């Protein structure tokens, strides 16, 4: 598959270009642009700047920002909003909202990889009212209805 072009603008000279850590990586790493190390106390939320803005290739694409799995499981450093959604028409700085769900403080170093940026297609839906919805095996069952 040919890579799609995502333009980026450097807003801070210390910013690092998003980079894929391995040839099979689905997301590129985003790095923190900080003046000094940033210590995040347990349950504290912070907004981490990246020093970058991007231009997605069209209205049918989105950039999704995810936590790095190692930071999440080892230190409890997660996305404060679960997943960041960067719309195709946004041109501001990419910032990473993070929360420390761990029991100990975690210090983010300047230049540290703090999140992952995944570019994905978007389907624009035409929402149509309906009196009835089609039947499925699952039906209205939710929240554990399909078993463990």
Q: Which ranges hold each PLM region?
A:
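DUTPase catalytic domain/fold
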Residues: 1-148
């Amino acid at each position: 598959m040919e890579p799609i072009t995502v333009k980026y603008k450097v807003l801070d000279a210390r910013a690092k270009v998003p980079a894929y850590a391995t040839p099979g990586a689905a997301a590129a790493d985003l790095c923190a642009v900080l003046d000094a190390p940033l210590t995040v106390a347990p349950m504290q939320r912070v907004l981490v700047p990246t020093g970058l803005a991007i231009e997605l290739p069209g209205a049918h694409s989105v950039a999704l920002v995810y936590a790095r799995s190692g930071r999440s499981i080892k230190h409890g450093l997660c996305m404060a909003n679960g997943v960041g959604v960067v719309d195709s028409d946004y041109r501001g700085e990419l910032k990473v909202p993070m929360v420390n769900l761990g029991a100990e403080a975690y210090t983010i170093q300047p230049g540290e990889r703090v999140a992952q940026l995944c570019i994905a297609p978007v389907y624009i839906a035409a929402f149509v009212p309906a009196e009835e919805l089609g039947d499925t095996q699952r039906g209205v069952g939710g929240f554990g209805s399909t078993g463990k």
